[in-house]
């Protein structure tokens, strides 16, 4: 039987490049190679595409070939340059492990759409909406979902610090893994936080801090028949959750404890799962997403953010939540590819 050819993309130009490589390493180690034939496409930090033997920390130094994904639907694959000539490598389905800008904002999804190649994960629209936290909140609020109070600060805006009630969080509107995020406890800290966030995006979000515990829910599926993982819970000792920025995240977070399943009642976990599914549907997600929320003391659930391409590293939350629900990583990868092929 011919194996299904899966193009696995990783790396990229965003600040989450290294996280993406780690995700691809785990996907490569757990994909069923009897059923699938993986083709590994690494993208350098400067945006150069290369076909390589496998994802690893030093993948660029391995035997690589220049490669591009053709937008020609008839070609349905990759153009790979070998011995000064291009050859066509047919692709049946694409699995992007690209995180952050260009990876989960609709950009690469647009290229997949042009190429006619089915792909794992959310479409252009839902990817773009979920990448921009302000748009996420607008759509969610219209669906009756609670969100933090928020203000959008554009490139030339100079907000008056005294108008806010502190603490607030300042975030790049379109970034991930907590890059550029700062908690601001007083008015005199605001300008610095905004300038820090502007290193990652010209559009900034100021959010009113929300009390309660941080929880998350992994969602899998394309339609009404959605599968959810076990709810997880993040207990912060200080600062913000930023495991992907830490030196040795494989050894555990420096400032947080993640519990799966969350130390909550069955009723609370069930409400969180149902809310996650409601958010997923409202935003038009498909394939997969991790929905992060706050559970307040009064039982109210407030949306934090939606990650349409969550990490697949050994320490990432999405695969851990699914594993706790009985779906190990090899099965999860298989399900995602099958969902992509079904459309």
Swiss-Prot record:
Binding locations of Mg(2+) 1: 305
Keywords: Antibiotic resistance, ATP-binding, Cell membrane, Cell shape, Cell wall biogenesis/degradation, Ligase, Magnesium, Manganese, Membrane, Metal-binding, Nucleotide-binding, Peptidoglycan synthesis, Plasmid
EC number(s) per entry: 6.1.2.1
Swiss-Prot/TrEMBL GO biological process terms: cell wall organization; peptidoglycan biosynthetic process; regulation of cell shape; response to antibiotic
Principal location listed in the UniProt entry: membrane
UniProt-recorded Gene Ontology molecular function terms: ATP binding; D-alanine-(R)-lactate ligase activity; D-alanine-D-alanine ligase activity; metal ion binding
Any one annotated GO CC term: cytosol
Ranges where the ATP-grasp domain occurs: 137-338
Cofactor note: Binds 2 magnesium or manganese ions per subunit.
Residues engaged in binding ATP: 133, 169-171, 177-178, 207-214, 241, 304-305
Short name of one Pfam family: Dala_Dala_lig_C
Subcellular location as annotated: Cell membrane
Induction and repression of expression: By vancomycin, mediated by VanS/VanR.
Record-listed substrate binding positions: 244
Domain of life per record: Bacteria
Cofactor dependence: Mg(2+); Mn(2+)
InterPro entries: ATP-grasp, ATP_grasp_subdomain_1, D-Ala_lig_Van_CS, D_ala_D_ala, Dala_Dala_lig_C, Dala_Dala_lig_N, PreATP-grasp_dom_sf
Chain residues that bind Mg(2+) 2: 305, 307
Family of the protein in this entry: Belongs to the D-alanine--D-alanine ligase family.
Function: Required for high-level resistance to glycopeptide antibiotics. D-Ala--D-Ala ligase of altered specificity which catalyzes ester bond formation between D-Ala and various D-hydroxy acids; produces a peptidoglycan which does not terminate in D-alanine but in D-lactate, thus preventing vancomycin or teicoplanin binding.
HAMAP family: Dala_Dala_lig (MF_00047)
Protein name as catalogued: Vancomycin/teicoplanin A-type resistance protein VanA
Species of the source: Enterococcus faecium
UniProt gene name: vanA
